[in-house]
Amino acid sequence: MADLQAILDSIHTDILPRIGEGKVADYIPELAKVDPRQFGMAIVTVDGKVYRVGDADIAFSIQSISKVFMLTLALGKVGESLWKRVGREPSGSAFNSIVQLEHEGGIPRNPFINAGAIAVSDVVMAGHAPREAIGELLRFVRYLADDESITIDDKVARSETQTGYRNVALANFMRAYRNLDHPVDHVLGVYFHQCALSMSCEQLARAGLFLAARGSNPMTGHSVVSPKRARRINALMLTCGHYDGSGDFAYHVGLPGKSGVGGGIFAVAPGIASIAVWSPGLNKVGNSQLGAVALEMLAARTGWSVFGD
């Protein structure tokens, strides 16, 4: 394998002059306070080696990247029947679009847009109190990363609860179409807390390693999902993981990935490694501007694109 530390160092050197590009997510008050002049990146290979550069050990709000872990939990609970409640197609619309949801009868286009993730949170609740569902997610992510220090940032969760009017609208829409089983405020309580998961690049890359290793965590030896399910989650990340910038990300980077408005991007090189990058400045579709640039550099310098080198 190429000298990954040297590649990471070269990416960091090339990114440094551009640090601060993009715009932080100012519609969530707590995220508006984050200094955009930060950049971190971590790679964990399937043989357990860890490579990092920059601010890879600083915890940030993973936001929509949490949807990958919630989807994994939901599929574990209800299997393929999940797809009766949420689709598997790219949306082509903004991640918080209401128009599409109404047009399609309350069935969200995919599990990674906000409406789809809210439906997935409803499935994970499975009759339990919000606190129990949040606890289940936190235990799961700590287990995946083998790190008990991972937490949920209550300030961020509160900040989203106070300003998430559009998510309230999406949830009420789905409840009206009978695609939510639990009270709207309970489901949103889970959703806002899952998005407030706080992790570093290294923790995130460790937690997602099972998706690079056919569903098992090679560092612990634990099977998380079947190889088939890991492959399908990766397929969804490739086609739907970056909102209406998913096609552009596939074109430039060519790896399954999931972004979040906290500036993080999680990506998978199947059979090789999991990758996490963080830079808080976002582009116009809500994805980390420099994070995407760094991953494009990584794919070019390693030949890891799933479409060939």
UniProtKB/Swiss-Prot annotation:
One of its GO terms (biological process) is glutamine catabolic process. GO terms for molecular function: glutaminase activity. It is an enzyme of class 3 (hydrolase). Substrate binds at residues 64, 114, 160, 167, 191, 243, 261. Its EC number is 3.5.1.2. The keyword Plastid does not apply. It catalyses: L-glutamine + H2O = L-glutamate + NH4(+). Keywords: Hydrolase. InterPro entries: Beta-lactam/transpept-like, Glutaminase. NCBIfam families: Gln_ase, PRK00971.1-1, PRK00971.1-2. Belongs to the glutaminase family. Homotetramer. This is Glutaminase. The gene is glsA.
